[in-house]
């Protein structure tokens, strides 16, 4: 059976077309040009007309170049030798270390059978009060971080990578600016977390289509480690770049566009990645946090809009803080009843008072007379934002709850906050003489 073809029928964008037989969808090929060789993946079959997506781009490729089909889909190596290593979007070493080619596994496999999943039950502590107290991250949860360009979403991921109580961090970068990539690397190395981290990074200087592999390669490795009993946290940034790469390929393939030019299968493509989040019975787990930037701060943009139907809530980053009103962890009730008996009460009461403080801020801005209660709310708002909402705050959950009580006692009387007497008697700070 012929597996090497020496004629390329057409080259359009990053897609080449050859006439070939016995080729499977998703099969990998090597395109050999005069000076280089590039990986390509079969993305369309029309009888013997085969379209391949070239991951390194088609610059330098001619119609006389050789295409060799490998007979298998994209693969990545899997072993503990990956710990502390940095790879590009195609799994090639980016850190100057040796190439790893043993124990290869296929990427892009199906999601775990729902019957094999267990109900989420464990909290992942991050040391960030706006997560731990108010929208708890739960093991095996899938959550996006909605943001706009310019917000410190990558800095937030760095904080989570450094502080999250997990066994392994897998960072998948898509279209990362070189400065952001270096910041991830240097921050994790300085913080001592690089040894438990695996990087798969497609930078803005790399071919755009290479970013399509990053989520699949990251999640394939995560699944294998989870099956070995490790608690894995996958951090992806930025899923909008991933969707834009899909859009670029769809336009090249002359697919009928859907909303704002994105392919019609955008939802299923995103879902197939997010649904990899799982907690295995008797083994480990995969938790996914994925940055999704919103062009123009538009939550109805196709990427965040579709994402919201797939995930179990979202963190909404605005003004350099995790916005409490736009953020939601739909699984927090699975775990915040197991932490401390005042957790849910503090969470509900503080957010309720913070919402009331927004009305007082508006009254002050419009020149209305301020009541004593308004002044208390204004003081509370300032303390809440500086001591709990600030992303630089790094304290354990129990200290964050104690701090919540301190803030309440600094601004209000016990009877003003609507909390049960037994909890007030147990946790209300005693004033020092």
Swiss-Prot record:
Q: Which UniProt keywords apply?
A: ATP synthesis, Hydrogen ion transport, Ion transport, Transport
Q: Which domain of life is it from?
A: Bacteria
The record's listing under InterPro entries reads: ATP-synt_VA_C, ATPase_F1/V1/A1_a/bsu_N, ATPase_F1/V1/A1_a/bsu_nucl-bd, P-loop_NTPase, V-ATPase_su_B/beta
- Respond yes or no to whether keyword Transcription regulation is given for this record: no
Q: Name one Pfam family in it.
A: ATP-synt_VA_C
Give an example GO molecular function.
proton-transporting ATP synthase activity, rotational mechanism
Q: Name one GO biological process term.
A: proton motive force-driven plasma membrane ATP synthesis
For this protein, the record's PANTHER family field holds: V-TYPE PROTON ATPASE SUBUNIT B (PTHR43389:SF4)
Q: What does this protein do?
A: Produces ATP from ADP in the presence of a proton gradient across the membrane. The V-type beta chain is a regulatory subunit.
What does the sequence similarity comment in the record state about its family? Belongs to the ATPase alpha/beta chains family.
Protein name as annotated: V-type ATP synthase beta chain
Q: Which organism is it from?
A: Borrelia hermsii (strain HS1 / DAH)
Could you tell me the gene encoding this protein? atpB
